[in-house]
Amino acid sequence: MEKVTIVSEIQPPQNDKERKTRERVACFLKHPNEEKFTLIEKQYGITVPWWWIEEGESLEQAVEREIKEEVWFLHIKKIKNLQITIQLERYEQKQDLNLHSVSHFFFAELFDLEQQIWEFNVIWEEKEAVLSKITPQVIKVARNSFAKNLDIKHRKELIKRS
């Protein structure tokens, strides 16, 4: 398993603050009939689908649950752990604590496009477009916390493993 740990240069952890760990799954979700992957458009930008893991839930269970709950696709063909984990250490001013975010990356393929109601605008893109579009948005979402440290090698590795 490849692990990348990034310490924010913009919001570095503070020695005297409580540390809270949050784990989440991020998923490269493949279209059932085309070589395209989904992006979701949220209020802060475009990203791959990602979600917090609930207590007592396995990583795979979180991926399956959230695909159904958040992007509303009903039939998942397969889920594969990409064995890549990105850990981000930063100070969260709003909560006045150090936040340790652990993101586990997955690939999932849909059986079909049957879905329920849309919560997000889902965009289907080819691998290269996903790589080019997600990078600025991930950086924005993380408030530039790891922009200087997450190099192109790691972004390409995420796409390559899916």
What are these regions (language model features)?
Residues A26, K36, N121:
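Conserved beta-strand and immediately adjacent loop positions that scaffold enzyme active sites
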Residues H104-F107, E114-A147:
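NUDIX/MutT-family hydrolases
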Residues M1-A26, P32:
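Acidic, metal-coordinating catalytic segment for phosphate/diphosphate chemistry
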Residues K20-R22, P32, N98-S101, I117-E119:
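A generic fold-level signal
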Residues L29-N33, A108-L110:
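Active-site beta-strand termini and strand-to-loop segments that position acidic
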Residues F73-L113:
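Active-site segment of metal-dependent pyrophosphate-handling enzymes
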Residues E23, Y44, V102-H104:
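Residues that flank catalytic or metal-binding motifs in active/ligand-binding sites
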Residues E34-L74:
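Conserved Nudix-box catalytic region and its N-terminal flanking loop in Nudix hydrolases
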